[in-house]
């Protein structure tokens, strides 16, 4: 019996020696190479790492250093200096579902072509990582990313999974060519719906904060968005600048606030903009609203040859159209003031009271062509119910027949200036007088 006991003891000691030898061998470069080769040869993935570290002070954690992981024949999905895998008792029933995974000092590529990771975690943590999404609808590049995803259950084309809570911060981020710094995002993913409970960032020398939701059909609901002290320069025309708004099925704006911001493009600019918008839904090239409101003022607005100073606009939106409560601006040395309504039915703009005073306006060289050109679909008719003009100067520098009218005054009522998308004086009455005029270099008084 003593002999059998000794044999069992020797066998046990030998097994322990082999186990410990194998344990320490796995933590060498030789062990890392063999594990990497075994995974690469027996799966559809390629894996490399320099060394695996395990410490008895943290027995539930495995540490991999200088890790590269991805699908065979494709660029690496993950490159990280350190991967810390937290194990739990779950590994007895689900070996590929771990407690935590910490990715540190590396790059994670997210795209629809990305192959699914073969493992899951209750929590994925990122520390000083870079995120890229090449080839996806959201062109994303982020650096110095920290945060977490809970739970993390990646699928094909969805590195973050189908349902998870997200909390991320980034030192710098570029989304669809728009750069930002000090970014904070808190929200959730529920299949194709993305909820952004908190969004904050520094961008264009200003700040952005908001709450938004992306629905499964690709439409957006912006509950609240604030832009403060933005100084943005763009190389896009005004129509190109707003073109992304027409690419989504719809954009519902609950509340938009813009404060002390300046935007500039190649042929347009607005400075010192303050804007407040409520309850407006944009759908392709149309809009809908229930009790919507717009208040806006700026120091300067430029669009092509149009140059407005100190414009003020207050309007209300409804299913019937737009109630223009106030529009005032300084233009061409004078003042323009009006109010009225745009009616969706008939696409008619009716201005109740329009006043133009102190204008010094030189007609553009192609004003005759502009006069004959059809107007946009949204403007079928224009009627001035009440009109007044005071001390205006109008000049035409056409060398074939130059003319100018000085100190032009006038008033009118029910003037229909647009009919069927065409300029003209179609109906109404008006009285005009001037202190002096010159027609083809002939003075008239």
Each language-model region and where it sits:
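N-terminal Sec-pathway targeting helices
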Residues: 1-17
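Terminal hydrophobic membrane-targeting helix
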Residues: 19-115, 152, 175-180, 206-208, ...
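Hydrophobic residues embedded in beta-strands of well-ordered beta-sheets
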Residues: 62, 194, 208, 220, ...
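Short, recurring structural edge motifs at helix starts
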Residues: 86-91, 171-172, 196-199, 241-247, ...
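Elongated, acidic membrane-bridging lipid-handling scaffolds
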Residues: 89, 99-190, 195, 203, ...
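A cross-kingdom feature marking solvent-exposed beta-strand/loop segments within repeated
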Residues: 179-184, 193-200, 206-209, 237-243, ...
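Long amphipathic alpha-helical scaffold regions
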Residues: 212-240, 338-368
